[in-house]
């Protein structure tokens, strides 16, 4: 998952939803059946920010009467006050400290951290760029990785794997990590921020066993 916008800053314009949709486009997600889970406060500030824009009259009426955004930026917006909140640890800046730097790694040896990164925090690595999943051409933005369980101040575990070998058909980033490359986390240290989520309908699946039939 990619994060766009500025954590902790109200979503008060269409630019952030458009960037969310653009990231899905860049990763070849289908353009139909997209949905966005958004908390009530973000929903309110976004509706206020859209008030001056030219929109279909029925959409404006729904926003004012129902307080719901409806469809925008190729996505159907749904209010949800159970949106997950990320709590950053007390340090968000560090760097690579040598170690194993081969393609496919899921952990980095690091230094410069005074506190262990929390599971779920998102970070980028200097010089490691996101790529188109089919053409493998590099995008201008850095690849984002998510901290997994077990990270410490010297060992940063993450997902997805950092696959930068051009010969690997599963390559997902461009560039080569190196000693002393900066590691930068999304958001400020010791801060909490909500994470509204835009996704395609088929991003998740619910699987269950057959229910027991009672005679």
What role is predicted for each listed range?
Residues 3, 13, 40, 56, ...:
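Short linear motifs in intrinsically disordered/low-complexity regions
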Residues 141-144, 148-215:
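Internal mixed-charge
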């Amino acid at each position: 998952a990619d994060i766009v916008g500025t954590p902790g800053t109200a979503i008060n314009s269409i630019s952030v939803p458009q960037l969310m949709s653009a990231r899905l486009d860049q990763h070849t997600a289908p353009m139909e059946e997209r949905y966005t889970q958004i908390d009530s406060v973000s929903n309110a500030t976004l509706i206020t920010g859209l008030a001056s824009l030219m929109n279909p009259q029925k959409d404006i009426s729904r926003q004012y009467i129902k307080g719901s955004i409806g469809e925008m930026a190729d996505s159907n917006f749904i209010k949800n006050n159970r949106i997950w909140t990320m709590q950053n640890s007390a340090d968000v800046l560090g760097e690579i400290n040598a170690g194993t730097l081969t393609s496919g790694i899921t952990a980095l040896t690091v230094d410069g951290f005074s506190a262990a990164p929390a599971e779920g925090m998102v970070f980028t690595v200097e010089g490691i760029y996101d790529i188109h999943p089919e053409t493998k051409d590099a995008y201008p933005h850095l690849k984002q990785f998510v901290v997994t369980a077990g990270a410490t101040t010297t060992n940063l575990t993450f997902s997805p794997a950092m696959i930068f070998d051009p010969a690997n058909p599963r390559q997902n980033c461009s560039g080569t990590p190196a000693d002393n490359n900066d590691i930068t986390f999304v958001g400020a240290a010791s801060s909490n921020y909500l994470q509204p989520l835009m996704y395609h309908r088929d991003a998740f699946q619910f699987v269950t066993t057959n229910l027991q039939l009672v005679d």
